[in-house]
Regions:
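Extracellular and organelle-lumenal recognition/adhesion modules and their flexible linkers in secreted
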Residues: 1-183, 200, 214-222, 285-287, ...
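Conserved, mostly hydrophobic/aromatic
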Residues: 40, 136, 194, 230, ...
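Active-site mouth of glycoside hydrolases
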Residues: 73-76, 91, 152, 157, ...
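The substrate-binding groove and active-site-proximal loops of carbohydrate-active enzymes
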Residues: 112-122, 167-184, 206-221, 258-273, ...
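Aromatic/acidic polysaccharide-binding cleft in carbohydrate-active enzymes
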Residues: 148, 208-212, 335-442, 449-452
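Active-site neighborhood of glycoside hydrolase catalytic domains
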Residues: 226-229, 233-371
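Short, well-ordered beta-strand segments enriched in hydrophobic/aromatic residues
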Residues: 452-461
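C-terminal beta-sandwich/jelly-roll accessory domains of carbohydrate-active enzymes
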Residues: 461-544
């Protein structure tokens, strides 16, 4: 910025000085007594006296301030400066402001304000990352689908340009979704987040295709090498070429990386299969243990076109999604498993995240549970959305600079977070003239107290309540009469949604289940997801 006024002389600066400010993304949430790290690069050939402050959105209220001073030669070269600011009050719509009363030219670059209490100390908002962690995710697919490919290859995610010091990353235009990213959330940060969550990273790599372009198989070699280099960055020793870059970023031990997905929905494109085989052969030659995911369906996979997993994306109306509970029932039981890496209810009744959409997705997941011998894993898409910049609906978690809430489908996922590693049990449902219900049963162990539960989930997608008689065989006296509970996700209307004004309008409600036993009558509300968690004696199994 060029400052033409001064503290004295004929052109005196106004009270408080002149300068620039940045509100961040729709305002910064500054909390009382919390410490915020400010990082910036500065250059100037003039003497500098620069006030850096956190202020209210109108600039009238000062929350915290720090002054950068230096002689005429101190900042001739780019200089990195870091300091902390601590506010004495709360303000959910703040801005970062730079002001001075000294004439001269000041260059600023790579300016950042970050709270000191991020999730695991790695930069993610603690409240949002904790919501994700509460789901006990088993894998994290990144950096995305269309985001990884781009509308044009020049705007695709290039992992090598997203590692190293943040200020040295060039950033890129995410033309798939229409915004610029500085790539502060890069390859390293995704791997770190997966590690912090205890989840397996699933890296989606560009296969030489974008929405409008495609690299021929004869010219794919450099992109193949780039992916192999990326795996070395994640898994290589600290003295390898790319492993040393990771080590310099503070993670000398290799990351876990067991899954690589080749492309995103490009099976139909001219060169996909030829390019895929080049990626497959090169990755397996160096890392034979990595599971490679194909964008083609199971029918295309053969010894000459191998894959460890195949990717499935499901977007449908709520009624259609409910019917897909049986989607994998007739899938051949041999060969590679599916990874349903994207699924969501879309359309009019999806809204911004309705109850009925969540119930349809629950029914779909019940079907995946029943077919877990042919389905490896599944994830909803998208996961997060900033309410100020919605590009897609619905999403599981909505946030702004200071608030967040889970949509009904987020709370629905809590009913399935104990399914990984659980034992599945067959179920049979007999209801006359009513086809709007599906159910599943698993046994799972609470890791905190090692108690074992039989979890029976029932999805009622219809508009009438149902009384059920549950009969459990093969347990004997294994169900304890106390310690069981019933949890219900429902609301007064199927199109109900959560919001910042009513963040818990559609959330699970739990109650003790009195006198749980092998045979019991239960009531299931219309438009509901109900879970019966029955506390068991150790080492018992069942047929339901």
């Amino acid at each position: 910025m060029e400052v033409l006024c001064d503290s004295k002389g004929t052109n005196v600066c106004p009270s408080g000085g002149v300068g620039v400010y940045n509100p961040g993304y729709w305002g910064m949430n500054i909390e009382r007594r919390k410490s915020y790290k400010v990082s910036l690069h500065i250059r100037s050939s003039d003497a500098v006296s620069l006030s850096v402050s956190l202020r209210s959105s109108d600039g009238l209220q000062k929350l915290a301030c720090h002054t950068i001073t230096g002689g005429k030669k101190q900042f001739t070269n780019w200089t990195k400066i870091e300091f902390h600011l601590k506010s004495s009050i709360n303000n959910t719509n703040s801005r970062l402001q730079f002001t001075t009363t000294k004439t001269g030219v000041i260059w600023l670059d790579q300016v950042s304000v970050m709270p000191s209490d991020t999730y695991m100390g790695h930069g993610f908002r603690k409240d949002l990352a904790s919501m994700l962690a509460d789901l006990k995710p088993q894998f994290l697919k990144f950096p995305g689908g269309n985001y990884a490919m781009g509308n044009y290859l020049r705007n695709a995610f290039q992992w090598g340009e997203t590692v190293g010091p943040w200020e040295e990353r060039p950033g890129h235009f995410n033309d798939a979704w229409g915004y610029w990213t500085d790539d502060g959330l890069g390859f390293f940060e995704f791997l770190q987040l997966a590690e912090d969550l205890g989840a397996s990273p699933v890296w989606v790599v560009n296969d030489g295709a974008s929405a409008n372009e495609e690299v021929s198989t004869s010219r794919i070699a450099s992109l193949v090498k780039d992916v192999v280099d990326g795996i070395e960055f994640a898994r290589g020793g600290p003295k390898t070429t790319w492993g040393s870059v990771r080590a310099a970023m503070g993670h000398p031990q290799p990351f876990k990386l067991d899954y690589v997905a080749i492309g995103n929905q490009e099976c139909w494109m001219l060169y996909y299969r030829g390019n895929y085989q080049k990626f497959y052969s090169a990755i397996k030659a160096s890392y034979p243990d990595i599971n490679i995911v194909s964008s083609c369906d199971k029918s295309t996979i053969s010894p000459s076109n191998p894959a460890d997993l195949y990717d499935v994306h499901v977007y449908a109306s709520s009624a259609n999604m409910f019917s897909r509970s049986s989607m994998f029932d007739n899938t051949p039981r041999s060969g590679p498993k599916a990874i349903v890496s994207e699924y969501a209810v879309t359309g009019n009744d999806a809204g911004k995240g309705t109850l009925v959409a969540a119930l349809a997705e629950a029914a779909f997941l019940v079907g995946l549970e029943k077919n877990s011998d042919v389905v490896e894993m599944a994830s909803c898409a998208p996961l997060f959305v900033n309410d100020n910049d919605r590009r897609w609906s619905p999403d599981a978690i909505v946030f702004n600079s200071w608030q967040h809430y889970g949509c009904p489908n987020y709370w629905m996922l809590h009913f399935f977070k104990d399914s990984s590693g659980a034992t599945f049990h067959p179920t049979a449902m007999q209801i006359s003239n009513y086809d709007q219900m599906v159910a599943s049963a698993i046994t799972w162990q609470n890791p905190k107290d090692k108690s074992t539960y039989l979890k029976i989930k029932v999805v009622n997608f219809g508009n009438k309540g149902v009384d059920l008689n549950i009969t459990i065989t093969g347990l004997g006296n294994a169900i304890k009469s106390s310690g069981s509970k019933k949890t219900v996700l429902t609301s007064s209307a199927p199109l109900d949604e959560n919001s910042f004004q009513q963040p818990e309008k559609v959330t699970p409600v739990s109650s003790l289940l009195a006198d749980a036993k092998q045979q019991m009558g239960v009531s299931v509300s219309s438009y509901s997801l109900t879970s019966f968690d029955l506390l068991l004696e150790p080492s018992k199994h069942s047929t339901i």
